[in-house]
C-alpha cells in the first residue's frame, strides 16, 4: 500500500489536449510562478482554511469542520464564486488523494487511454508523490503500457529531474519568454533554470514538447528570434515546438486587457522559425 498524498485540483478522465492520444489528465494544486496570463490562477495557492469563501457560496456547499474547509460536491454547481473570492489564489474544491487511490482511478480508465499527464498548478512541487505514482504505473502489469508525461513550467532542479527520470516518458515544458527580464515581468521568476531543464531533458530524450505562448506586445520571441532559434536547434531535430496563442478567457488582472493572439501573428512566428531551420512546429487549430 502507498498512502503518500497529494493535493489535486481536478481529474479529467479523457483529454486530447494534454499530450498524444487520449489521456487521463491530473491537475495538482500549487504553483511557484505567478503568471499574469494564467488561465487557471486558482491552482496557484494552497488553501489555508481561512473560511472566507464559505459565505460567498450561493449553494452553501462549503463549511468549516474541525478547522478544515469541507466541500460538498453534490451541492456544488461549479459557479466558481468561491475561487474568485479567494485571497490565496486557491480553491476549496481541491481533494487529497493517496497514490493507491489515484492508481485505482487510473485502472478504471486504463483500457480507454494512451497514458497519463500530470499537470497543475506545477506538478513537480509534489515530486515525491509524482515519483511514487509513476513508479506504481510502471510496476503494474495492467498499467505499464501507459505513457507517463509531466506538463511543467520547468523550474524543477536538475537533481529533481534525475530522480523522476527513470519513471517518466517525457515532459512538456513552457518557455514563456526568451529574455530573463521579460520572463520575470510575466511570471515573477527568472527563466535560467527553465532553460537548463529544457537542455537536460532534451539530452536525455525526455523533452516531449517545447511550448511557446505568443502574447502580442508582451512576449519577446520575435525580438530574440536568432538566439531562440539557435537554442531550439541545439535541442535536436525530433523536438516538437508547440506555439500557443494567448487568449483572454479565464485570465484576471491586467492580462484581461491584453490583446489575444491571432492566426496571422502565430503564422508569422512560425515562418520566422522555419526560416531558421526550426521545422517541427505545431500551431493552434482554433483561435478566439
Task: Go through each PLM region and give its residues.
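N-terminal [4Fe-4S]-dependent radical SAM core
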Residues: 1-69, 75, 84, 108-112
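Auxiliary Fe-S-binding modules of radical SAM enzymes
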Residues: 1-20, 214-288
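Flexible, glycine- and charge-enriched loops at secondary-structure boundaries
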Residues: 50, 92-95, 187, 191, ...
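Short Fe-S-cluster ligation motifs
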Residues: 60-66, 78-88, 101-122, 288
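FAD-binding FR-type
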Residues: 68, 74-75, 95-101
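Conserved AdoMet/S-adenosylmethionine-binding subsite of the radical SAM
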Residues: 100-257
Amino acid at each position: 500500500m502507498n498512502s503518500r498524498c497529494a493535493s489535486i485540483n481536478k481529474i479529467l478522465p479523457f483529454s486530447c489536449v494534454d499530450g498524444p492520444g487520449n489521456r487521463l489528465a491530473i491537475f495538482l494544486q500549487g504553483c511557484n510562478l505567478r503568471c499574469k496570463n494564467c488561465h487557471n490562477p486558482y491552482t496557484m495557492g494552497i488553501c489555508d482554511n481561512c473560511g472566507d469563501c464559505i459565505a460567498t457560496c450561493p449553494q452553501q456547499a462549503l463549511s468549516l469542520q474541525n478547522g478544515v474547509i469541507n466541500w460538498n460536491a453534490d451541492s456544488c454547481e461549479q459557479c466558481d464564486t468561491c475561487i474568485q473570492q479567494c485571497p490565496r489564489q486557491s480553491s476549496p474544491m481541491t481533494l487529497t488523494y493517496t497514490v493507491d487511490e489515484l492508481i485505482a482511478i487510473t485502472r478504471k480508465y486504463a483500457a480507454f487511454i494512451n497514458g497519463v499527464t500530470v499537470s497543475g498548478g506545477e506538478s513537480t512541487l509534489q515530486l515525491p508523490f509524482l515519483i511514487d505514482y509513476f513508479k506504481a504505473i510502471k510496476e503494474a502489469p495492467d498499467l505499464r503500457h501507459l505513457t507517463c508525461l509531466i506538463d511543467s513550467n520547468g523550474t524543477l532542479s536538475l537533481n529533481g529531474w534525475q530522480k523522476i527520470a527513470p519513471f517518466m516518458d517525457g515532459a512538456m515544458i513552457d518557455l514563456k519568454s526568451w529574455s530573463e527580464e521579460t520572463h520575470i515581468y510575466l511570471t515573477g521568476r527568472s527563466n535560467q533554470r527553465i532553460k537548463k531543464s529544457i537542455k537536460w531533458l532534451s539530452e536525455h530524450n525526455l523533452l516531449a514538447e517545447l511550448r511557446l505562448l505568443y502574447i502580442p506586445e508582451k512576449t519577446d520571441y520575435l525580438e530574440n528570434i536568432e538566439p531562440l532559434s539557435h537554442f531550439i536547434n541545439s535541442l535536436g531535430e525530433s523536438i516538437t515546438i508547440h506555439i500557443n496563442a494567448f487568449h483572454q478567457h479565464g485570465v484576471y488582472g491586467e492580462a484581461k486587457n491584453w490583446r489575444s493572439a491571432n492566426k496571422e501573428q502565430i503564422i508569422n512566428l512560425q515562418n520566422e522559425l522555419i526560416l531558421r531551420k526550426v521545422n517541427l512546429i505545431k500551431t493552434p487549430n482554433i483561435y478566439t
